[in-house]
Amino acid sequence: MEKKIIFLCFFVSLLTLPEFISSQVLVEDDVPFPEKKFADRGECIRACAAKFTDGDLSKIKDVLPRYYKCVCWYYPTS
């Protein structure tokens, strides 16, 4: 019984490890978008990529259009 509990704890920690690691390198920042009140998702992705990742769209994880700005989650360039 004790080995099963230890194995279960190890298994759960193994499952949560990738989420913990990815949350450590993900950066949240915003970029002003004065052209529109609420930008399209594609416009936000392009604006975030241009400002934070030197135009690399693959490093943008998610964007959220807000009032005259875009909130970006991205992997920083090294």
Swiss-Prot record:
| Site entry (Important for inhibition of KCNQ4), positions | 69
Q: In which tissues is it expressed?
A: Expressed by the venom gland.
Annotated S-S bridges: 44-70, 48-72
Which key words tag this protein in UniProt? Disulfide bond, Secreted, Signal, Toxin
Q: Name one GO molecular function term.
A: toxin activity
Where does the record locate the signal sequence feature? Answer: 1-23
What GO cellular component term, any one, is given? extracellular region
| Region of interest (Important for inhibition of KCNQ4), ranges | 34-37
| Localization annotation | Secreted
The entry's free-text remark on domains says: Has the structural arrangement of an alpha-helix connected to a beta-sheet by disulfide bonds (CSalpha/beta). Since the toxin contains only 2 disulfide bonds, it is called 2ds-CSalpha/beta.
Family of this protein: Belongs to the SLPTX(15) family.
The name of this protein is U-scoloptoxin(15)-Ssm2a
Specify the species. Scolopendra mutilans (Chinese red-headed centipede)
Upper classification of the source organism reads: Eukaryota, Metazoa, Ecdysozoa, Arthropoda, Myriapoda
